[in-house]
């Protein structure tokens, strides 16, 4: 299992790298669960990280197909982009938007679709239905997150339900990632249900998700991740 830390700027990116994060994720927490950073800030994050770690970028929740394709194109040079489906509750538009993201992204950039455990409240497409959408779009993986940050993932979906979802993702040939107000205490459960990647922000910050990423906190989280089995993420997504 590997550790993704979401950062909102270059200073936080350097702290996450120094703390040992495996993936540096560009995201603006003030703009929601998948808030996209400005292009200049993404460029600054990429410069700060260099070749030290893969960088991912949140595209936000899907708008129209043209906007999604443009956002994916603007994130060229990252290892993967993450697309959410807040406000999208049926399969056909989800497929169209996911395909647009895949078309817009560079060929070397993987696509990760984001399902929300609290999909009824988001509202969004149910996580199990998003698996087929991901396969259709040529995505590399799926991330199960929470749209509203008022409860952690495993309080919304019990571990056995998450394990069933992860198994379906793996059966489709995709990797499974978990996020959603996770803490280090949740990592053992994430490993047990089969996730290849865990994503955090609040747990890595001093002052919660609106605070700043701490090198020491990232290092402490990485120590918990290192006990996990080796990742099976595709080599094209992470080195």
What are the functions of these language-model segments?
Residues 16, 45, 142, 190, ...:
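Conserved, mostly hydrophobic/aromatic
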Residues 39-48, 90-103, 200-239:
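C-terminal helical cap(s) of enzyme catalytic domains, especially alpha/beta-barrels
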């Amino acid at each position: 299992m590997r550790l993704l830390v979401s950062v909102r700027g270059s200073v936080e990116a350097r702290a996450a790298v120094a703390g040992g994060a495996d993936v540096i994720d560009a995201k603006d927490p003030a703009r929601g669960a998948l808030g996209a950073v400005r292009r200049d800030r993404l460029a600054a994050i990429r410069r700060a990280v260099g070749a030290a770690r893969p960088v991912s970028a949140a595209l936000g929740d899907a708008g129209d197909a043209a906007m999604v394709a443009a956002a994916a194109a603007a994130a060229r040079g990252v290892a993967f982009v993450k697309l959410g489906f807040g406000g999208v509750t049926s399969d056909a538009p989800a497929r169209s938007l996911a395909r647009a993201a895949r078309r817009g992204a560079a060929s070397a950039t993987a696509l990760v679709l984001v399902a929300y455990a609290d999909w009824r409240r988001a509202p969004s497409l149910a996580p199990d239905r998003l698996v087929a959408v991901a396969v259709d779009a040529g995505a590399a993986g799926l991330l199960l997150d929470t749209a509203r940050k008022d409860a952690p993932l495993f309080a919304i979906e019990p571990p056995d339900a998450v394990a069933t979802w992860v198994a379906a993702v793996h059966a489709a040939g995709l990797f499974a990632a978990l996020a959603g107000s996770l803490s280090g205490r949740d990592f053992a459960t994430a490993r047990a249900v089969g996730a290849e990647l865990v994503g955090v922000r609040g747990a890595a910050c001093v002052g919660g998700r609106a605070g700043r990423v701490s090198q020491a906190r990232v290092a402490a989280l990485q120590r918990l991740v290192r006990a996990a089995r080796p990742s099976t993420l595709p080599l094209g997504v992470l080195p």
